[in-house]
A protein has these predicted regions:
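Short, solvent-exposed aromatic-acidic interface loops
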Residues: 45-52, 115-119, 181-185
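Short, conserved active-site entrance elements at the starts or edges of catalytic domains
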Residues: 132-155
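Conserved, well-ordered active-site substructure
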Residues: 80-105, 151-206, 211, 216-254
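Extended Lys/Arg-rich, glycine-bearing segments that form polyanion-binding/interaction patches
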Residues: 94, 98-132
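Zymogen propeptides
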Residues: 1-100, 108-111
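Short hydrophobic-aromatic micro-motifs
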Residues: 69, 109-111, 142-144, 150, ...
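A short, polar/proline- and glycine-enriched secondary-structure boundary/capping micro-motif
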Residues: 52-55, 119-126, 187-194
Length: 254
């Protein structure tokens, strides 16, 4: 995108490349991430506590977590629906309306659809059987097993209006793509959820999931916002998804 620069971070355990593109008059921010181990893909909560009344800016949470790159999560503190797994524990079970995205210890993304997990016991067994470390519940699923999804109605995210969007996708084993679509400069077009699916599908991502959008849609790279959040400012929120280096702090900072 005119006027933007490519940013990157690289060490022996992680490669991150961030860039912007103007697509159909939308400002699209992308971050490609490759990691050495699934443990480098993590979730952080504001105040490091589930259910805390403390909301924080994503840059603060990313800094506290020593994140190389981060994207907003599902903003679980703003709603009461969905399934929340954090550090392998089930904290919220209200699955009847949202598709969920689970993250395994090996770094894979696994989707569930409405009606697949109907009891807390089923969720706990699913977590154990698949070695789940955390989950997010926003959605919908944008791409699944290489098939682009079409969503016309959904409980959250105002899917049928033009809106800022955020998404996370898994390209391959330990290989991911983050995406944010916002208004920036002369690029004024926000997108519907199906247009967001088109954009990440066009990047060759076989599995992708929508995160909270609007002003929440934020990517943090090297400690600073990389995209332009709505109204030009970060908003306080409750959670981020982030990638960390596996090198100890002193080595990574040298």
């Amino acid at each position: 995108m005119e006027g933007s620069e490519i940013e990157y971070y690289c060490d022996e355990t992680i490669l991150v490349i961030a860039w912007k593109e103007a697509i159909n008059n939308s400002a699209c921010s992308f971050v490609e991430v490759k990691i050495a181990h699934g443990s480098q893909l993590r979730r952080a909560l504001s105040d490091n506590t589930y259910g805390s009344s403390v909301y924080m800016y994503p840059t603060q949470m990313a800094q506290n977590a020593n994140a190389v790159v981060a994207i907003n999560g599902d903003f679980y503190g703003h709603r009461s629906c969905g399934i929340t797994i954090y550090q392998r524990q089930l904290y919220r079970f209200n699955p009847r309306t949202l598709e969920s995205c689970f993250f395994t210890a090996s770094g894979d993304m696994i989707f569930t659809h409405v009606g697949e997990l109907n009891t807390e016991e089923e969720v706990k067994k699913f977590v154990q059987d698949n070695d789940i470390t955390f989950s997010v519940s926003f959605g919908p699923i944008l791409v699944e097993n290489g098939e682009k999804k079409t969503t016309n109605t959904y409980l959250v995210g105002e899917v049928d209006i033009h809106y800022s969007r955020a998404a996370i996708g898994q390209v391959d084993k330990l290989h991911y793509l983050l995406m944010s679509i916002n208004e920036e400069g002369v690029y004024k077009n926000r997108v519907t959820i199906n247009q967001a699916a088109d954009l990440i599908y066009a990047k060759g991502v076989p599995n992708a999931y929508a995160l909270d959008g609007g002003q929440t849609a934020t990517i943090v790279m090297n400690g600073e916002t990389f995209n332009r959040p709505d109204w030009g400012n970060e908003r306080i929120m409750t959670d981020i998804i982030y990638f960390a280096t596996a090198i100890p702090g002193e080595e990574a900072s040298s």
